[in-house]
Amino acid sequence: MQSVETDRTTFTDLAADAHPAARVPVEVRVDVDDPFLAYRRARDETGGVYLATTGGQSGWGYFGTAPADFREVDPRAGGTLAALTEFLDGERLVRGDCDVPYPCGAVGWLSYDVARELESLPDSADADRALPNLQVARYDRFAAWEEPRGESVTLRVTACPRVDDFETPELAYEFGKQHALDLARAAAQGDPSVEDPPVETDEATFESDCTRESFADRVQTVKQYIRDGDTFQANVSQRLRAPAAVHPVEAFDALRTVNPAPYSALLEFPGVDLVSASPELLLHRDGDRIETEPIAGTRPRGETPDADDRLETDLLDDEKERAEHAMLVDLERNDLGKVSKFGSVEVSDYRRVDRYSEVMHLVSVVEGRLRDGASLQDAIAAVFPGGTITGAPKPRTMEIIDEVEATRRGPYTGSIGLFGFDGRATLNIVIRTLVRYAEEYHLRVGAGVVHDSDPDREYQETLDKGRALVNAVDEALGRRVDLAMEDQQ
């Protein structure tokens, strides 16, 4: 049963005082058993976006379907962040009493290779996939819910008509109410099935672009650069590929069960689908407050609680992990400092341990206050790409990454972003993410290399990080999926 929470008078009073181009939310509520099942019911042939947030954003999750607008930027065009700003420009939101952080907004992803527009980088890595630098869609309505949730959840469906698109505020209200009711009904009553994947195969083996030995060579090359003083730490990755034998919706449905993560997302976009279990926040902006949450330091999960505790103690006591984490926190402090008011940058949470299904991580929180005149675009440019998935110093380390990795990263270590129409934004770092492109799943996994890194240990860390994604495809297929690169020679 749907209930309309925004009355006509409240809406028209807000609209009367608002800027003509402003959007005013109309809220409808509906109870559902599971938000992702509701998304499956509501999505159509155009796909949609689902952001399963269990951390950040005060514990809110969102989904959107039927985008009102879409933009894509080719890498050869340049100006990616400016194009994103242009896409968001002109949007205003008058929220009134609506406390949903994002009642409407835009969702998109930025390629790691946007870094080539921010720094002068070589073109050593092969651009073997014709992927864009940006895909972003605008949603005039969202379904939102608060985490954690019980056995059932109340979806708060908000439609945000633009006042000047209608002859009167009353007409805008009626449109918004109907628009919200349509999504609420679809979420409660639609067909949750998805179309079959385009690939029909009994094989879903992930194969790497390098062997254990060639990955070790990458690590040794980076260690030589460290000895030469070019870098202190660098994130080195390998790319895994498998036929796209399961639909992204099915893969995400399994992934959210086997490895729930605070910045997970499913993006179904033209030509590219992202299935992400990212645990890492690149940037959150709310008013003038900005923050980032660097992750540096990893251990596998133990088989028992006692083993877990021993591994956590080992992680906290490890001098290599301690030094690497401190260095990267300092890097993020410096990045935020580029756009923050003097003296406002601080570390509010240092070296906590977060546990996930396959691994545990060291995490810190760095905060600042955006200086007067600095924009969201400035803030993104200051922190992008994240220091934890490049290294320190960042520009030189990105040059080294481009040299040692065989192919361009694409979405990996780029960002998935949720952008509000009031300047609010939340961007993750694209790690632990399946990318479906050209009937294949691509999965990149990396490890931070420092002066005393052991190549075999770093290689194993990449496998540990990729395991949850492989398990999700395994569960979706209902059979064993091999991580074949473990045995490659």
UniProtKB/Swiss-Prot annotation:
The EC number of this protein is: 4.1.3.27
Kindly list the cofactors needed.
Mg(2+)
Residues given in the record as chorismate binding sites: G297, T298, Y412, R432, G446, A447, G448
Matching entries from InterPro entries are given as:
ADC_synthase (IPR005801), Anth_synth_I-like (IPR019999), Anth_synth_I_N (IPR006805), Chorismate_C (IPR015890), Para-NH2Bz/anthranilate_synth (IPR010118)
Amino-acid biosynthesis as a keyword of this entry, yes or no, is yes
EC category = lyase
* Top-rank lineage group of the source organism: Archaea
Provide the residue positions that the database annotates as binding Mg(2+).
E324, E461
Q: How is the cofactor bound?
A: Binds 1 Mg(2+) ion per subunit.
- Bias (Basic and acidic residues) occurs at 300-309
Q: Which reaction does it catalyse?
A: chorismate + L-glutamine = anthranilate + pyruvate + L-glutamate + H(+)
Instruction: Kindly list the positions annotated as binding L-tryptophan.
Output: P262, Y263, S264
Q: How does it assemble?
A: Tetramer of two components I and two components II.
Q: Which family does it belong to?
A: Belongs to the anthranilate synthase component I family.
PANTHER family, A to Z: AMINOBENZOATE/ANTHRANILATE SYNTHASE, ANTHRANILATE SYNTHASE COMPONENT 1
Q: What else is known?
A: Component I catalyzes the formation of anthranilate using ammonia rather than glutamine, whereas component II provides glutamine amidotransferase activity.
Q: What is this protein called?
A: Anthranilate synthase component 1 1
